[in-house]
């Protein structure tokens, strides 16, 4: 029977393991809610599902394009629509799983009217200073070039305060009444999991993946400035030691987890302890089935 749930949580919380286990047991379709897994060439840095998982589970949102191609929330919504159509046609459950909460929030709240990205020569610091002066309620990371340019584009084209423009032109969301489950971890235990995962990624060839990526593509591409790859670039350029590389990835990933935890408070979600999550969700799937 078709139904859909979202499974969210911080990086290294075990979301993918839970989703894959449920998908195998209940023949569910999975939509990856991850802004890095969409790229074909980024496998280790994105903690992408294994080749075995991708071969045995019907996945959407993975390996869609190359790192030099642009991906955004509009394209993600189209991928969600494909996943839903596939699951509906076969009467299968759909699991939306990942850590890019912004995509899930947009699917629930809806997109705003499309505007062009600014072609201004202003740098991130200059745009961010303008944003703080004009539109302090608009929340963007200072290094998020794409969203800063989008913000400036709205302001240039409309002369409205962008946060107010977006609220006024917002369309209806594509997700309605979806149950959202969030995997909860003790902060100190999560830090240890992040440290362990960082070591595993390096042992599994993260540096080799980074070498190939930086030899083929412009290192300024947004995808190549993600956590794990940007630190590898510093190491490959001789700016930091291997020990510093491992420590920096761990620190930056821990900081990301904190931001994800804060963002996820925007959702009306049900908290699940990892050890109890499978049993709870198995019961949910069995009832729906």
Swiss-Prot record:
Q: Which gene encodes it?
A: miaA
> What is the recorded name of this protein?
tRNA dimethylallyltransferase
Enzyme Commission designation: 2.5.1.75
- Family membership, please give it: Belongs to the IPP transferase family.
GO terms for MF: ATP binding; tRNA dimethylallyltransferase activity
Return the annotated site residues (Interaction with substrate tRNA).
Answer: 100
What are its cofactors? Mg(2+)
Q: Which reaction does it catalyse?
A: adenosine(37) in tRNA + dimethylallyl diphosphate = N(6)-dimethylallyladenosine(37) in tRNA + diphosphate
**What residues does substrate bind to?**
11-16
Q: Where does ATP bind?
A: 9-16
Function noted in UniProt: Catalyzes the transfer of a dimethylallyl group onto the adenine at position 37 in tRNAs that read codons beginning with uridine, leading to the formation of N6-(dimethylallyl)adenosine (i(6)A).
């Amino acid at each position: 029977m078709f139904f859909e749930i979202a499974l969210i949580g911080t990086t290294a919380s075990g979301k993918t393991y839970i989703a894959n286990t449920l998908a195998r047991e209940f023949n569910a379709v999975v939509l990856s809610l991850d802004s890095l897994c969409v790229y074909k060439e980024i496998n280790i840095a994105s903690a992408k599902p294994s080749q075995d998982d991708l071969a045995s589970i019907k996945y959407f949102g993975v390996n869609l394009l190359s790192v030099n191609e642009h991906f955004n929330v509009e394209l993600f919504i189209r991928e969600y629509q494909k996943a839903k159509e596939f699951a509906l046609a076969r009467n299968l459950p759909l699991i939306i799983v990942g850590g890019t909460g912004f995509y899930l929030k947009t699917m629930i709240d809806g997109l705003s009217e499309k505007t062009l990205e600014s072609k201004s020569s202003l740098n991130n610091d200059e745009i961010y200073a303008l944003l703080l002066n004009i539109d302090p309620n608009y929340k963007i990371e200072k290094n998020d070039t794409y969203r800063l340019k989008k913000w400036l584009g709205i302001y240039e084209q409309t002369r409205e305060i962008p946060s107010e423009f977006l609220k006024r032109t917002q369309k209806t969301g594509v997700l309605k009444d979806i149950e959202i489950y969030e995997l909860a971890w003790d902060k100190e235990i999560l830090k240890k999991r992040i440290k362990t995962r960082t070591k595993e990624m390096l042992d599994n060839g993260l540096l080799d993946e980074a070498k190939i990526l930086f030899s083929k593509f412009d290192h300024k591409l947004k995808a190549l400035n993600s956590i794990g790859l940007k630190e590898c670039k510093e190491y490959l350029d001789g700016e930091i030691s291997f020990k510093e590389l491992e420590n920096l990835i761990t620190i930056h990933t821990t900081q990301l987890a904190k931001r994800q935890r804060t963002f996820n408070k925007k959702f009306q979600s049900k908290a699940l302890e990892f050890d109890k999550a499978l049993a709870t969700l198995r019961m949910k799937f069995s009832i729906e089935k």
